[in-house]
Amino acid sequence: MTLNVDEEVERLKEEIKRLAQPRPDGSYVVKFGVLFSDDRCANIFEALVGTLRAAKKRKVVTYDGELLLQGVHDNVEIVLLKPPTQATQAEGVGA
């Protein structure tokens, strides 16, 4: 089964929520090493780092650096950003 990038980003969001600790602001945070070593994620994502980069480009997640490597960057926090509220989305229309 091949997922397109948008589908992979949606799956990534689900997996981060499953593995992460929620924050009071509505975001979720998980260490890269936890994501990378999770069996379920390994089975879903052919290229986890590529999916993370696509999600970062879409402003779905944020993390320090550009390229994450297993071992070296295991403690880097991946933050699933809180989705914008309807009011925030409406403010952006026509801007």
UniProtKB/Swiss-Prot annotation:
It comes from the Eukaryota. Gene3D superfamilies: Costar domain (1.10.10.1540). Transmembrane segments: none annotated. Signal peptide: none annotated. InterPro entries: Costars, Costars_dom, Costars_sf. The lineage of its organism: Eukaryota, Viridiplantae, Streptophyta, Embryophyta, Tracheophyta. Belongs to the costars family. One of its GO terms (biological process) is regulation of actin filament-based process. This is Costars family protein WS02710_H03.
